[in-house]
Amino acid sequence: MANISQKYAQALYDVAEEQNLTDDILNELDQITISVKGLLREVRAIDNNPKLAKNERQQFVENVFKGVSKPLLNTLFLLANNSKLSLIPEIDGDYRKIYNQVHSQDLMKVESVYPLSNEELDEIGKAFIKRTGLKKLILENQVNDSLIGGIRVSIGTKVYDGSIQNDLNQLTKSFQQMK
């Protein structure tokens, strides 16, 4: 399914870029995804209902998603007609990946034992901007008591682990290899 959602996301991004709506659609798609995630079972039921005619599916989209930009609405019509509305969360994720790549930015999750201040997050962000070469990092702090101390940073698929828990794990492995 990932390839299908990537194709929809890329097509939507291309149209959004032509119309200078990439930011607007990113925000609209995020809002729609939040709504759809809570109703995924119902959305799948709509996708899997062979008795729903195309005009009924389009009417559903018009009623539920009114007010969204034209390119996004057309994509939602296409998803409804192809019984793929349940792919909205995946399309949102793929659209965000494309958006982040084009804008040379990414999400940076910083795990710490306690909530970090904005100043601390900014300093960590600046260090990782230099390290990664990205123009911007979207910072998110998550509290993780199991780290004992230090931080663990995730950017995309890369993890930078500077936690005491990781140091202890590495030390344990070293001792086990000595046996």
Question: Can you describe what each PLM-predicted range is?
Answer:
Residues 1-179:
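Elongated, mostly alpha-helical coiled-coil "stalk/stator" tethers of large membrane protein machines
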